[in-house]
Amino acid sequence: MAQTDNHLVIMAGGVGGRFWPMSTADCPKQFIDVLGVGRSLIQLTYDRFAGVVPSDNVWVVTNQKYVSLVHEQLPEIPLNHILSEPCRRNTAPCIAYVSWRIKKENPKANIVVSPSDHIVTNEAEFKRVISNCLKFTAETDAVVTLGMKPTRPETGYGYIQADLSTASARNREIYRVDQFREKPDLPTAEQYIKQNNFFWNAGIFIWSASTIVNAFRIYQPSIARIFERIMDVLDTADEQRVIDEVYPECENISVDYAIMEKAEEIFVCPADFGWSDLGTWGSLLAQTQHDIYGNTVIGKDVHLFDSKNCIVHTTEERKVVIQGLDGYIVAEQDGKLLICRLSEEQRLKQFTGEG
């Protein structure tokens, strides 16, 4: 497998409403320096594939309104690799579009699909796992998804049940998927944790271009027909005009329902590289450094007194003083201020009306 055949697809069309006020419809969280490290989440996603996928083989699928943001933050990737969705249709049409596009450019392409807003703390292990999976999919017709080894009974993630009794003959770290499970209630999640064959579904996929295109032809023929019909205009001056016309015809469906739960050659690679989907303020608190009282502070002039288990995030050069809070989010961005119990953050979209 030549590294020049490796391609990365970054899905970057989401709004991230659960991270209000930092993340808004005008500038979602993937374009923000959430961790205070000088790089946005989409830039960190791009960075962690260095040495695995050449920059010329990186693709981003995003909403039309974010194309300029992607180009501004990732100037290294070809401009014609930033694909613009005219409307939101979930992950299956997004992946189909870019897969047909990549296959037209390189029929031998091997593809990793990654969300734009996850974080990884052990990048060396991440690269090892991804490279291992790419080698496997280059040699087989398999569809591989990464399964994160759970560290707690999490109810916010879907789970993958693996058959650990038999590893693939080609790769001893990759196993067949028994079943995909929906987000569980707490008692069910606690049962999953007691077993060693349940993994968090990270939404990271690895497959060859020919494998995923064939899977769409078999399991989602209506979506496949749309992109087969427009193959001749892909990578031409007419591409965006035609995509704007036909993309709304695609069914609004996730790749999990469209392909993963139907296909036969589905494998999971259990992994442990410090992963978080960073979907909530609570997940950010769990992934960042705390003071001795369990507080996380991202900001230049923040002072806490008699407070614990709080996350404070400010991007403005303002003095922030907090006293007597336990388990709160305090976040400020562009004149908007959030003060909310961490235990109530699932209601943020309800509170703000955004996302």
What is the role of each PLM region?
Residues 60, 83-84, 113, 144-148, ...:
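General beta-strand structural signal in soluble alpha/beta enzymes
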Residues 42, 98, 117, 160, ...:
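Residue-level signal for inorganic ion chemistry
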Residues 123-237, 241-243, 267, 317, ...:
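Conserved core of the sugar-phosphate nucleotidyltransferase
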Residues 10-12, 61, 112-115, 145-149, ...:
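Short beta-strand segments
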Residues 2-5, 209-355:
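Left-handed beta-helix
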Residues 1-10, 18-25, 36-115, 121-131:
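Conserved N-terminal catalytic core of the sugar/cofactor nucleotidyltransferase
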